[in-house]
């Protein structure tokens, strides 16, 4: 809820929206749906079959006053019931509101919050988390991707200086966290000794074995000028960041990402989203030209990998060396994009690509920014002026994208054909077989409007066979 004291001018990610998870919480064989909420309680819907869902949020004990962002599901205590881990962030400095939450499934449609007990109630500004077995010891460790609240995008030369001069408590919130599972119901923060201690603006994370050494690596998609991180697992509890030698370039305003094999060669590829419109008018009115001086400083003086403002799709050539082919595939420009999902929706054995997008305020509009600057010069820099200008900004919902993978590195925009035709401000997305018919359905979390639930009709039209594991 925007107010003069609390809006996109006070918190850069005010309009970023929330995630969604699909998980069977009561072991009845039907996948249920959990929605994280910004400025609104989380919601848990029980699947009653035939695409009918019951809201059990209040009785389940998963509603909260926190600003929830990403959501992950895991059976953290190995009792056979899926638990829910919620990342929190928002326009606040209150650690009680920032603390991530772990909802332990009691097996009776209720949950108990136990983040602090497990030692994973991270109080940074968290975007998403992923559970994975970092050290191949048979239990799941946890990587929590955080983002800095200190944005000096306009003056990148001073950002690190400003960050380092902040009090330790504030500075540490700019770093993501790696937790090692001790196997006894507790986790330890091993970020510094593992080699992951780097500040950033994490908005997307993907975990996979990119270099084929048998250990899971971590890719972090960073917003603004900080380059994406590609952490390669050394198999001894440490990681080496080495994106510079693995890709020719990356996205600039990196958002969501996903890892999957798009050409069925057995190697894991990587999609990363940015915010460049495909529409010529929006491209010219909303996007700045590349800043040559900034680009030169970041690449030549800082040594960052070159970053460009478009989606990237990196084809794995082996051992984690990638060729970027986003433009070649026609997936490079999808507007202000958020979630990327690489998954086979039409059961043809090729991974398709879903992209959610939309941003509530066109705050990158050149005319709007010029008018704001004029008002600042003539009336002074105040929150009241910014709030007034925000109310005058365009609010343009746009449609999401789905690209059909035809094989042989050919993607077609199938958005309209497959039913993605309603404009929205969409962020989090998840897939799962909600009706157990052998194809994957999609749930999308929208900002300030009802969610989208897409029923996949593939199996109504095909005679494919499938195997279901229960």
Language-model region placement:
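Acidic, glycine/proline-rich Ca2+-coordinating loop motifs
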Residues: 1-470
């Amino acid at each position: 809820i925007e107010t003069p004291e609390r809006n996109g001018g006070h918190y850069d990610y005010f309009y970023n929206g929330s995630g969604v998870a699909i998980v069977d919480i009561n072991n009845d064989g039907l996948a249920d749906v959990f929605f994280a909420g910004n400025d609104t309680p989380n919601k848990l819907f029980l699947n009653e079959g035939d695409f009918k869902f019951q809201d059990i949020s209040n009785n389940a004990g998963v509603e909260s006053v926190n600003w929830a962002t990403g959501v992950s599901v895991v059976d953290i205590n190995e009792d056979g019931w899926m638990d829910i881990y919620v990342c929190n962030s928002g326009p606040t400095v209150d650690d009680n509101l920032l603390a991530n939450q772990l909802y332990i499934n009691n097996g009776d449609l209720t949950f108990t919050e136990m983040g602090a007990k497990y030692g994973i109630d991270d109080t940074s500004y968290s975007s998403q988390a992923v559970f994975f077995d970092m050290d191949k010891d048979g239990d799941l460790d946890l990587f929590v991707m955080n983002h800095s609240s200190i944005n000096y995008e306009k003056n990148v030369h001073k950002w690190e200086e400003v960050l380092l001069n902040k009090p330790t408590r504030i500075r540490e919130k700019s770093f993501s966290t790696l937790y090692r599972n001790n196997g006894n119901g507790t986790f330890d923060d091993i970020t510094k000794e593992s080699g992951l201690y780097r500040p950033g603006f994490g908005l997307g994370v993907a975990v996979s074995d990119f270099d084929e050494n048998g250990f899971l690596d971590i890719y972090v998609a960073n917003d603004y000028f900080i380059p994406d991180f590609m952490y390669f697992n050394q198999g001894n509890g440490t990681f080496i960041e080495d994106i510079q030698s693995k890709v020719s370039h990356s996205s600039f305003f990196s958002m969501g990402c996903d890892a999957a094999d798009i050409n069925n060669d057995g190697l894991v590829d990587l999609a990363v989203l940015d915010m460049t419109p495909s529409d010529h008018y929006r491209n010219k009115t909303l996007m700045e030209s590349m800043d040559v001086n900034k680009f030169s400083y970041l690449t030549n003086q800082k040594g960052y990998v070159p970053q460009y403002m478009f989606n990237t799709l990196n084809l794995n050539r082996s051992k984690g060396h990638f060729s970027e082919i986003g433009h070649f595939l026609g997936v490079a420009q999808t507007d202000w994009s958020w979630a990327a999902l690489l998954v086979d929706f039409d059961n043809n054995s090729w991974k398709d690509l879903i992209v959610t997008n939309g941003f509530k305020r066109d705050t990158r509009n050149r005319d709007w920014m010029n008018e704001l600057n004029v008002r600042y010069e003539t009336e002074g820099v105040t929150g009241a002026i910014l709030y007034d200008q925000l109310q005058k900004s365009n609010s343009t919902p746009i449609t999401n994208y789905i690209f059909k993978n035809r094989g042989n590195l050919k993607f077609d925009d199938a958005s309209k054909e497959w039913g993605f035709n309603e404009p929205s401000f969409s962020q989090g997305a998840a897939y799962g077989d909600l009706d157990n018919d052998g194809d994957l359905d999609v749930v999308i979390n929208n900002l300030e409007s009802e969610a989208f639930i897409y029923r996949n009709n593939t199996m109504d039209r095909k005679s494919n066979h499938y195997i279901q594991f229960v």
